[in-house]
């Protein structure tokens, strides 16, 4: 911004008429105000694209946007943080208990911590993706068999007095990871997960599973993928046959509509926060054609979650009360590439790869 200030001063000095010079200076300053605001608003996320990104010697705001667009995980962190903030604004206006707001904030911190820690493990051993998917499927099946029963639905486990929904935490990551790892073990894991959703039963999560696998099958039909899709469709059909009698929970279910009864701004916050969840998929789809499978799965998984919340008494992801979806969204970012290769050469890609290790160190700082 200092360079812009010097340019304005030089241009003003060349204008002989004092009135015109003053008007030019004022017009230029007003034009810079949006850049100044953007610079300060984006500063918490500067660590995601490198130190000094917003300094006078570093990137301009436009450069920041360009660099951030090549980092899907960084975009996801920013969107998750903003969506949680909008959800907190809604709950605050709606009169939700302060404990609800605190739980969502803690869930965001946990999600970002896991994103940083687990991200390093995945870099060290990506070959274990199939086994990881199978292990998560086992956890979902255990929940269906041993979890808390609420009006015939067995979707939750209790930890320290809190109920968490493992399917909201694990299933999005499983689907997006399956876009990049479709071996026999991963396929078996997806089939077990589909069975778990039918046993629970959980219509919303079964629909999320079918939506994510469906878009993958359309983009790249393969034997393992078709088998997993068939199981997910059967699971979703099974949940449709069984009645879902759970009542709506305040600040959790149906808030895409009820928020407008509180205030128009509260409704706009809920809708805006929900839309932010899809931004990483949209940006990644346009910027990184080589990994479109992952972005499509990510986008359809969370779109299905939002649609389920709109159509029935199911949790509204991120913007409603509940930490499971917040943690699940953060974990699902693990399956997205850290750095896209769009618009960069071989040397720049190598430099970008070198940046991925320090990027992990800054995930929590950027999220704060």
Residue ranges and their predicted role:
Residues 10-20, 25-39, 45-49:
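Short, low-complexity, charge-dense intrinsically disordered segments
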Residues 193-216, 240-247, 260, 311-321:
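Helix-loop-helix junctions and helix-breaking kinks within/between transmembrane helices
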């Amino acid at each position: 911004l200092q360079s812009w200030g010097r340019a304005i001063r030089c241009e003003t000095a060349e204008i002989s008429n004092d009135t015109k010079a003053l008007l030019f200076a004022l017009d230029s300053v007003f034009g810079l105000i949006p850049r100044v605001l953007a610079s300060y608003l984006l500063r918490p996320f500067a660590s995601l694209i490198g130190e000094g990104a917003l300094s006078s010697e570093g990137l301009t705001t436009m450069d920041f946007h360009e660099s951030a667009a090549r980092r899907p995980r960084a975009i996801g962190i920013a969107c998750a943080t903003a969506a949680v903030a909008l959800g907190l604004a809604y709950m605050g206006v709606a009169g939700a208990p302060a404990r609800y707001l605190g739980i969502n904030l803690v869930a965001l911190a946990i999600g970002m911590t896991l994103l940083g820690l687990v991200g390093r493990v995945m870099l060290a051993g990506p070959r274990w993706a199939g086994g990881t998917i199978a292990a998560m499927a086992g956890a979902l099946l255990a929940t269906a068999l041993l979890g808390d029963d609420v009006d015939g639905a067995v979707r939750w486990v209790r930890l320290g007095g809190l109920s968490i929904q493992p399917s909201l935490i694990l299933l999005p990551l499983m689907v997006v990871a399956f876009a990049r790892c479709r071996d026999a073990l991963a396929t078996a894991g997806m089939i077990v997960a589909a069975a778990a959703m039918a046993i629970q039963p959980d219509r919303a999560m079964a629909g999320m599973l079918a939506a994510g696998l469906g878009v993958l099958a359309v983009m790249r039909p393969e034997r393992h993928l078709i088998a997993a899709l068939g199981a997910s469709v059967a699971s979703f059909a099974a949940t449709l046959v069984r009645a879902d009698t759970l009542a709506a929970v305040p600040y959790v279910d149906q808030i895409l509509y009820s928020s407008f009864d509180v205030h128009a701004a509260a409704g706009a916050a809920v809708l805006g926060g929900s839309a932010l969840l899809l931004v990483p998929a949209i940006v990644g789809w346009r910027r990184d054609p080589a990994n479109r499978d992952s972005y499509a799965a990510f986008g359809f998984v969370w779109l299905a979650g939002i649609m389920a919340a709109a159509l029935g008494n199911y949790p509204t992801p991120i913007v409603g009360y509940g930490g499971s979806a917040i943690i699940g969204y953060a974990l699902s970012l693990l399956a997205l590439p850290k750095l896209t290769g769009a618009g960069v050469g071989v040397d720049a890609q190598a430099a970008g790869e070198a940046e991925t290790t320090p990027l992990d160190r800054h995930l929590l700082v950027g999220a704060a």
